[in-house]
Swiss-Prot record:
Signal peptide: none
Organism of provenance: Tropheryma whipplei (strain TW08/27) (Whipple's bacillus)
The protein's name in its UniProt record: 1-deoxy-D-xylulose 5-phosphate reductoisomerase
Binding-site residues, NADPH: T10, G11, S12, I13, Q38, N100, E102, G178
UniProt keyword annotation of Zinc present: no
EC number, UniProt record: 1.1.1.267
GO MF assignments: 1-deoxy-D-xylulose-5-phosphate reductoisomerase activity; manganese ion binding; NADPH binding
InterPro entries documented for this protein: DXP_reductoisomerase, DXP_reductoisomerase_C, DXP_reductoisomerase_N, DXPR_C, DXPR_C_sf, NAD(P)-bd_dom_sf
Record gene name: dxr
Domain of life where this protein originates: Bacteria
Chain positions recorded as 1-deoxy-D-xylulose 5-phosphate binding sites: K101, S126, E127, S151, H172, S185, N190, K191, E194
């Protein structure tokens, strides 16, 4: 039986994980829960599993992880707030089921160096879960490229991004997700972050990581091998499967999702990204290749831009413009440099510095 801590238990991934565990109670024991919002739901979840180990907020979540004996931690917190939970999980030698890609992107090589055993970080993102499964079909040296699939979001065929409302941006065509990742999917920024995540998790150079649009969201990603073979992982669009795979690793999950209906006629399209989406993807590649604190800076820039859009301060069309502007200003003013400080302190300091810069940029744009 695996002892599980879920941080971000009241969010989209957290609640889906709880539903999965309730169907597989013989395999999992929830020993801790943490959330930043919906405290009444958090209390209800704790009662269901009979645990008194609960926490509110990012700092308390990290303390809970350090103080509680567990086999696996599901980090389902949204955004940079998940950094401390990832740090605490790796520091205490627990296995990390990672839905919070932002923390890995921020921590980068530092977090990879903290891992104490193979498979300590198991991805929850459907794309990276698919890659992890497909890479079992060959040796690392035999991999030619990784191909990340993207639904294209709700605006793939739209020429102009002007006039898009918050409701429009949250209406994802295939996935049920939280607001931040839904908007990041709509701008394709999420796919840019996933390129950085794939590079860190699998050690494949950026030049060998491609993106294709697959509107049906059935093929979740692919690995192309040097002999010309392509190994893909396909399933219905349901996050329960990658959640279950990450929690059950190295075994496959039971009672996850229904199989595809192979007797029914299906259409699988694969299309190139649009010029609009490549702006996000290329910006992420640039930050990832630069390394150091730059991926953390990029993430903070985007989080501030998305929050400004959600607050009605900027238009949807300006999200990536703000992200790019803040990132460019930061890189002009600061360079990656060695520091005697704890890397987590450095990351948090530069994250805060970026957010102050973003605040000024957004205020100036709002005044125009």
């Amino acid at each position: 039986m695996q002892r599980v801590i879920i941080v971000g238990s009241t969010g989209s991934i957290g609640t889906q994980a709880i539903d999965f565990i309730l169907k597989n109670r013989d395999s999992f024991l929830v020993v801790g829960l943490a959330a930043s919002t919906q405290t009444s739901l958090l209390r209800e979840q704790a009662q269901v599993f009979g645990t008194k180990n609960t926490a509110q907020g990012a700092s308390e979540a990290a303390e809970l992880i350090e103080a509680t004996e567990a086999d696996v931690v599901l980090n389902a917190i949204t955004g940079a707030a998940g950094l401390l939970s990832t740090y605490a999980t790796l520091k205490t030698g627990k296995r990390l089921a990672l839905a919070n890609k932002e923390s890995l992107i921020m921590g980068g090589k530092y977090f990879l160096d903290m891992t104490s055993f193979k498979g300590q970080i198991t991805p929850v993102d459907s794309e990276h879960s698919a890659i992890a499964q497909a890479m079992k079909s060959g040796k690392f040296s035999e991999v030619n490229k990784l191909i990340l699939t993207a639904s294209g979001g709700p605006f793939y065929d739209r020429e102009s991004l002007e006039g898009i409302t918050l409701k429009d941006a949250l209406d994802h065509p295939t996935w049920n997700m939280g607001p931040m990742i839904s908007i990041n999917s709509a701008t394709m920024f999420n796919k840019g972050l996933e390129i950085i995540e794939a590079h860190l998790l699998f050690g494949i150079p950026y030049s060998q990581i491609d993106v294709v649009i697959h509107p049906q969201s059935i093929v979740h990603s692919m690995v192309e091998y040097k002999d010309g073979s392509v190994i893909a992982q396909a399933s219905v669009a349901d996050m329960t499967l990658p959640i279950g795979y990450a929690l059950s690793w190295p075994n496959r999950a039971l009672n996850a999702v229904r199989p595809l209906e192979w007797g029914a006629r299906q259409r699988w399209d694969f299309l190139p990204p649009t010029e609009n989406s490549m702006r996000s993807i290329n910006l992420a590649r640039r930050a990832g290749e630069a390394g150091g604190v730059y991926p953390a800076v990029l993430n903070a820039s985007n989080e501030c831009a998305v929050e400004a859009f959600m607050a009605g301060k900027i238009s949807f069309a300006r999200i990536i413009h703000v992200t790019e502007t803040v990132f460019n200003l930061y890189t002009k003013q600061h360079t990656n440099r060695e520091s005697a400080k704890n890397p987590i302190e450095v990351i948090l300091e530069e994250d805060a510095r970026t957010r102050e810069l973003a605040k000024t940029v957004i205020e100036n744009m709002s005044a125009d």
